[in-house]
Amino acid sequence: MKRIPEPFRIKMVEPIKMTTLADREIALKEAGYNPFLLRSDDVYIDLLTDSGTGAMSDNQWAGIMLGDESYAGSRNYYNLCSAVEHFFGYKLTVPAHQGRGAEQILFPALIERMRQVRGGETPVFISNYHFDTTAGHIELNGGKAINVVTEEAFDTTTPYDWKGNFDLNKLVETIEEHGSKNICAIITTVTCNSSGGQPVSMENMRSVYEIATKYDIPVVIDSARYCENAYFIKQREEGYADKSILEIIREMYQYGDMLTMSAKKDPMVNIGGMCCIRDHQELFQAVQTRCVPMEGFVTYGGMAGRDMEALARGLYEGADEDFLHYRISQVQYLGERLREGGIPIQYPTGGHAVFVDAAKILPHIPADQFPAQALCNALYLEAGIRAVEIGSLLLGRDPETGEQKASELELMRLTIPRRVYTNDHMDYIADALIELKNRAHELKGLMFEYEPPVLRHFTARFREID
């Protein structure tokens, strides 16, 4: 993939400040050795997430000034509905403040439908790989989240184009094991964040939908990074090279019945999400019923009118092919720099981040001492760069036994915000991590000082193990 320069001009900048090592040592200790608890002023380059951290365009900012803040029936809501139908073909839209808001109004409705319509008793959701908040919402509502991602996802060194794919045999086996009446939904996560921002092929999405249809199970598309997934399909899958991103997106969403979206990723807004349903009026009404007490009235769902307008415009900008080429190329550039420096990563690189294989860099730190978290802390001390753990810490404990689950992958995610950093920043990141690798054997594992019962990685506190 030939890299291109940024397909935009920079109109506004925000100064960032390098701190001293002594400053960073104090800041990290005060944060309980958890990068989530660092103050942003103490961070030089912030790679914690691409969620809500991108730069909006002049067109989106112009839309902000056209916000209709009517409590009910905002024109910006209808602009958003029009954009949703244009891209996805779904007619029913409920806004939410972000992706987890969409999940918390949809999942209980799916569980209720499983019990009342399907006669099920034990709610189960199956995904290629549930992300943390998705699994958290399922478990908080008494459900079980099961992942059936392809085995190739767990081999970080072997190139494979579709490391986000479902293992179709495991999918069928899981449905049969738990009984189709207990399966609330199959969740297709595009791209698959927990396996390294890896794409799902169109063929796999189609096959999953065929299996779901056979068993009468609805399919939810977790759509945080659907544009990046569409771009990978165009680049890698036979028969799609000459199709537009719009055409590919429209076909992808034929293989789903509804979607949840954190719009803070591909549409490049700072806040917002939505739950959209193809045409199931009864389910739509159930979601609306939960929206009012949980998120807000059904035509704003926790979002200001101005933010809905920015989101409607961002749906178009995120699907621009020139932007996507630049976006994926920048992530790939960082990945190649790291590989040249001997850093093991999930390969090929995914769409929104480079995932560093911390288990290979820190083989002396066991999974229950969180090697990827230790590497995140060391990178912050080295260069003021904030990354995030995707491994056993995020995976959590078995809800039935309380035992720590060992993740198949211990990854440090270097998440690249959209339209924010240049390749000079990528070089700085690569140089810092390559330098850190030379003293990786000195790093220590971590143990909890405070462990929250749910989604613990956000607010947990740690100490180093001597």
Swiss-Prot record:
It is an enzyme of class 4 (lyase). It comes from the Bacteria. Its EC number is 4.1.99.1. Coiled coil: none annotated. The modification N6-(pyridoxal phosphate)lysine is found at residue 265. It catalyses: L-tryptophan + H2O = indole + pyruvate + NH4(+). SUPFAM superfamilies: PLP-dependent transferases (SSF53383). One of its GO terms (molecular function) is tryptophanase activity. InterPro entries: ArAA_b-elim_lyase/Thr_aldolase, Beta-eliminating_lyase, PyrdxlP-dep_Trfase, PyrdxlP-dep_Trfase_major, PyrdxlP-dep_Trfase_small, TNase, Tryptophanase_CS. Keywords: Lyase, Pyridoxal phosphate, Tryptophan catabolism. Pathway: Amino-acid degradation; L-tryptophan degradation via pyruvate pathway; indole and pyruvate from L-tryptophan: step 1/1. The keyword Lyase applies. Its cofactor is pyridoxal 5'-phosphate. The keyword ATP-binding does not apply. Homotetramer. Belongs to the beta-eliminating lyase family. This is Tryptophanase. It comes from Vibrio parahaemolyticus serotype O3:K6 (strain RIMD 2210633).
